Amino acid sequence: MSLVSGLTEVTDADFETEVRGSELPVLVQFTADWCGPCRQLAPVLKDIAFEEGDRLKVVQIDVDRNPGTTVAYGVLSTPTLMVFRDGEPVRSMVGARPKRRLMEELADVL
């Protein structure tokens, strides 16, 4: 079940295929059920996924259930947002932010 309705949840098992193997840039939210700022960010990510779906894939991964990927990318805080392009991380951002600011930060990777 998705942590945020409307967003795809990835796991340690399918991260390689879903994120690193994607033809589109991928915005990954490293999140947790107990994370308040993650919940604040949820409507922003849903909007971006809907509006930018042809240019950007938006997914989430639960840090508690997927420690392998979390550790592999050095995620220490939630929410951490990481952008992958051509299978490699190209941007990392920590903390919730309004949609306008997030879109400005994503402009050069879209």
Region locations from a protein language model:
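Proteins that catalyze or organize thiol-disulfide redox chemistry
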Residues: 1-57, 65-68, 72-80, 85-110
